[in-house]
Amino acid sequence: MAASEQPQAGELLAKARRAFLEEFGAEPELAVSAPGRVNLIGEHTDYNRGLVLPMALELVTVLVGSPRVDGLVSLLTTSEDADEPRRLQFPLPTSQRPLEPGTPHWANYVKGVIQHYPAAPLPGFSAVVVSSVPLGGGLSSSASLEVATYTFLQQLCPDSGTIAARAQVCQRAEHSFAGVPCGIMDQLIALLGQRGHALLIDCRSLETSLVPLSDPKLAVLITNSNVRHSLGSSEYPLRRRQCEEVARALGKESLREVQLEELEAGRDLMSTEAFRRARHVVGEIQRTAQAAAALRRGDYRAFGRLMVESHHSLRDDYEVSCPELDQLVEAALSAPGVYGSRMTGGGFGGCTVTLLEASAAPRVMQHIQEQYHGTATFYLSQAADGAKVLHF
């Protein structure tokens, strides 16, 4: 069985150019791309100021466009999964008339970045968005679009901010325009990804370090359950609130400052459910540090064991898995050549990530599909680069 054939950035760029020419009657002047990501380990730790270990994917969002002089922004997306309408036009924000979220939802990510963009004056522009990052699959299509938008705006009106500041603008856009209180991991990896490396991110200090991930004998398999989720639903904000309440009860700024022994000792200060939520986060931060060390020394078995522990904790303590994800993980773990597998992303659907021997990939995909009650989509991806300006 083969992984889903994904268009390369060059093909997406050609598609975006054609769509732009058709829509606006001229060739676009500018083009940028930003990747989706998969988080290898460190789930629901980023908004708890913890550690995460994502890698950028070869799945990307491409944005092409040209400035215009009438102060309007005109957008088109070619994504069939995006909500209608697929095209819209609106004026640039002013201090008296800021942009506000609305419908279509896909455009809110673009609007949010425009609203919070720090440099001025920003001209109006026409743009087309083309993406190979699946929507709602837990591979961060939202941050991919935000970072592509930011990178595009930089070409129109250069900024002077740090990479961390750019990531924070994109994060703020998601908070205020999509209503998702996300951490900063997705935006940072979309900006900082480097081919052949995962990126260990400390979400407290925003320090990052590259972790080599280029062994040709190793493969990263992403399996989409094709069960869609919306993180704006009640569960994601509820988990975040529970974590903050536990940190407060223990007199800490965040769960990053909490050791497992302290959590156990303070068990009576919180509900059983809140304790389990915090136990996942505290344990996951430890697992992520251990996993990065295992990857650096090439100990894939140890890394795989930590992935499985992570999944069990997400399933049992954090309760963000679902039957489909559990089924995909169990199927992967019963196949020869697999080091480890876990759900990845926010949960309640979306994807699993599996570390395996590259030579075993076709057999493993076949095995998972045979065991899975639904229809899975597979992506094999190398660790890829972050956002970039493209040249025609």
Curated annotation (Swiss-Prot):
Pathway: Carbohydrate metabolism; galactose metabolism. The lineage of its organism: Eukaryota, Metazoa, Chordata, Craniata, Vertebrata. The gene is GALK1. Alpha-D-galactose binds at R37, E43, H44, D46, D186, Y236. Homodimer. Its EC number is 2.7.1.6. The record marks R37 as: Transition state stabilizer. The active site is at D186. InterPro entries: Galactokinase, Galactokinase_CS, GalKase_N, GHMP_kinase_C_dom, GHMP_kinase_C_sf, GHMP_kinase_N_dom, GHMP_knse_ATP-bd_CS, Mevalonate/galactokinase. Keywords: ATP-binding, Carbohydrate metabolism, Galactose metabolism, Kinase, Nucleotide-binding, Phosphoprotein, Transferase. Catalyzes the transfer of a phosphate from ATP to alpha-D-galactose and participates in the first committed step in the catabolism of galactose. ATP binds at G136, G138, S140, S141. The modification Phosphoserine is found at S230. GO terms for biological process: galactose metabolic process. Belongs to the GHMP kinase family. GalK subfamily. It comes from the Eukaryota. GO terms for molecular function: ATP binding; galactokinase activity. One of its GO terms (cellular component) is cytosol. The keyword ATP-binding applies. This is Galactokinase. PANTHER family: GALACTOKINASE-RELATED (PTHR10457:SF7), MEVALONATE KINASE/GALACTOKINASE (PTHR10457). It catalyses: alpha-D-galactose + ATP = alpha-D-galactose 1-phosphate + ADP + H(+).
